[in-house]
Amino acid sequence: CLVGSEMCIRDRGICDDGMKYGCASVCIPASYVKQAAEYVAGKLPICTVIGFPNGYDTTAAKCFMASDAVANGADEVDMVINIGEMIRGNEAYVQDEIKQICDLAHSRNAIVKVILETCYLTDAQKKRCCELSEAAGADFVKTSTGYGTKGCTIDDLKLMRASVSDHVRVKGSGGIRDLDTVLAARAAGASRCGVSATEKIMAEAEARYREGKL
């Protein structure tokens, strides 16, 4: 990173790629949200994560993180559920935490994506977490942080899509590194894919389009 309050060079590059390719948003570390928002000047939505990567921060801490992020210019907040509480079956805790963050973010016109970290949950827990997220007001349910034991799977995307109404969108993330995986994820019900290989995937898409195969 550069000294002082400058954004990390890598994060500036991510913003440049996001604007170049018309990405839905770019995900930036919370400490650089303000600089990123100023840098893109409204040309690109800024996202950040809270409770990353295991969701074990207290609800109050997560709410502060969300409030701080939105105040600094974040348009989207990706929150990790408290995985331990979900596994324990403490559904009231999980839903209440999601609702508090959704209420806070929505009051400031930001959207919330709820990260399940599906690799640690049973199918029944994944389904239930999707239902709790929708009941709490989430805009998206999202598979993974990318830091778990496994990322996005097609089966998980299908399950999640079937577990929420059309009012909630599904995002796949973790291990999506090529165009074929993006297309498979979309076919399985994902409205968005979280990727770090944007330039590579777009190059594949452009080449395939020129060949008349897309």
Where are these regions (language model features)?
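Single conserved hydrophobic/aromatic residue that forms the stacking wall/gate
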Residues: 1-4, 8-9
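Catalytic cores of alpha/beta
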Residues: 57-68, 121-132, 155, 161, ...
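Conserved, mostly hydrophobic/aromatic
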Residues: 36, 69, 114, 141, ...
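Alpha-helix-loop-beta-strand connector modules within alpha/beta enzyme cores
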Residues: 30-54, 89-113, 120, 135, ...
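Glycine-rich tight-turn/loop motif centered on a GG-T
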Residues: 19-22, 50-60, 81-94, 209-214
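Glycine-rich phosphate-binding active-site loops on the catalytic face of alpha/beta enzymes
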Residues: 48-52, 71-86, 135-151, 172-209
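Catalytic beta/alpha-barrel core
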Residues: 6, 23-31, 55, 66, ...
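Active-site cofactor/substrate anionic-group-binding motifs, chiefly glycine-
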Residues: 20-76
